[in-house]
From Swiss-Prot:
Protein name: Tagatose-6-phosphate kinase
Pathway given in the UniProt record: Carbohydrate metabolism; D-tagatose 6-phosphate degradation; D-glyceraldehyde 3-phosphate and glycerone phosphate from D-tagatose 6-phosphate: step 1/2
Catalytic EC class: transferase
Its EC number(s): 2.7.1.144
GO molecular function terms listed in the Swiss-Prot or TrEMBL record: ATP binding; phosphofructokinase activity; tagatose-6-phosphate kinase activity
GO annotation, cellular component aspect: cytosol
Pfam family, one: PfkB
Chemical reaction(s) catalysed: D-tagatofuranose 6-phosphate + ATP = D-tagatofuranose 1,6-bisphosphate + ADP + H(+)
Family: Belongs to the carbohydrate kinase PfkB family. LacC subfamily.
Endpoints of the signal sequence: none
Keywords, ordered alphabetically: ATP-binding, Kinase, Lactose metabolism, Nucleotide-binding, Transferase
Biological processes per GO annotation: D-tagatose 6-phosphate catabolic process; lactose catabolic process via tagatose-6-phosphate
Length: 309
């Protein structure tokens, strides 16, 4: 079983517009609202892929109830209730672009943070892999993911971390290391304090930096150019085909779902990387965030090339 953790979930609202006009009224006909937050995208894709998945995080208010009520029944909902209200995040799709408006989310008390920590420990009993995704809610210290990873490690669970900024830096500088991290080039540049490009030689060098010591997998997203990955002492480039992108929202989360599934099923490197990229691409072909059309899975799987470099 896979446990997905979304500490700062949201209701994701999508507004498609032919044109975004500033300083005037924009009327939207086709509005989509879904339970959101990176970890919830992960759990929906895992569910559609056929994995047994349990979802947790901190939710509150009517917006929190919306999330529970709109997740598929086959996902085991194990959320922790807080006093604040779950946030709303808006994506405006216009002229081939995407503009996002993201609420910060609720402030958690010390008691609520401690309560979730105990809740998390309890949920680990029957899981193999834990995914930790997205931003931390207000009130949580930057090293909170580090704390959860330490607990998971003590219980023999594999962990996939997908976050950025101070939370990611705290984990990299801490003692407890996740099994996998999945930065993109922008996040990698921020971590290292220098601009990174898609140059394989440069990527190979920086992924051997002591900052990443102790992390088994580092999977760097290159967007439409695929992935550059390091597993222990082996490096891979993943070439992906060109596809028509409907919406890239949630594609990185779908990739995390593939990584978690690969770990849970003890797949070899090539199978894990291929599955992860296929699920990310399938999500990009859909309007709905965190959704994949499995009818297209096999065709895309055959088109992906994983090369050791």
């Amino acid at each position: 079983m896979i446990l997905t953790v979304t500490l700062n979930p949201a209701i994701d609202v999508s507004y498609p517009l032919d044109e975004l006009k500033c300083d005037t009224v924009n009327r939207v006909v086709d509005v989509t609202k879904t339970p959101g937050g990176k970890g919830l995208n992960v759990c929906r894709v895992l569910n559609e892929f056929g994995e047994t998945v349990k979802a947790t995080g901190c939710i509150g208010g009517e917006s929190g109830d919306f999330i529970i009520n709109h997740l598929p029944d086959s996902i085991l909902s194990r959320f922790y209730k807080i006093s604040g209200y779950t946030r709303t995040c808006i994506a405006i799709l216009h002229e081939g672009n995407q503009t996002e408006i993201l609420e910060k989310g609720p402030m958690l008390s010390v008691d609520e943070i401690d309560g979730f920590t105990h809740h998390f420990k309890y949920l680990l009993n029957d899981v193999d892999v834990v995914t930790l995704s997205g931003s931390l809610p207000a009130g949580m210290p930057d090293d909170y993911y580090q704390k959860l990873i330490g607990i998971a490690n003590l219980n023999g669970k594999k962990t996939v971390l997908d976050c950025s900024g101070n939370a990611l830096e705290a984990v990299l500088k801490g003692d407890s290391k996740p099994t996998v991290i999945k930065p993109n080039l922008e996040e990698l540049s921020q971590l290292l304090g220098k601009e990174m490009t898609k140059d394989f030689k440069a990527l190979k060098a920086v992924l051997q930096d002591e900052l990443f010591e102790g992390i088994e997998w580092i999977i760097v997203s290159l967007g439409a150019d695929g992935v550059f990955a390091k597993h222990k002492d082996t490096f891979y480039n993943v070439d992906i085909p060109k596809i028509k992108i409907v919406s890239a929202v949630g594609s990185g989360d779908s990739t995390v779902a593939g990584i978690a599934s690969g770990l849970a099923n003890d797949e070899d490197d090539r199978a894990l990387l291929t599955k992860a990229n296929v699920l990310g691409m399938l999500n990009a072909q859909e309007k709905t965030t965190g959704h994949v059309n499995m009818a297209n899975y096999d065709k895309l799987y055959q088109s992906i090339k994983v090369k050791e470099v």
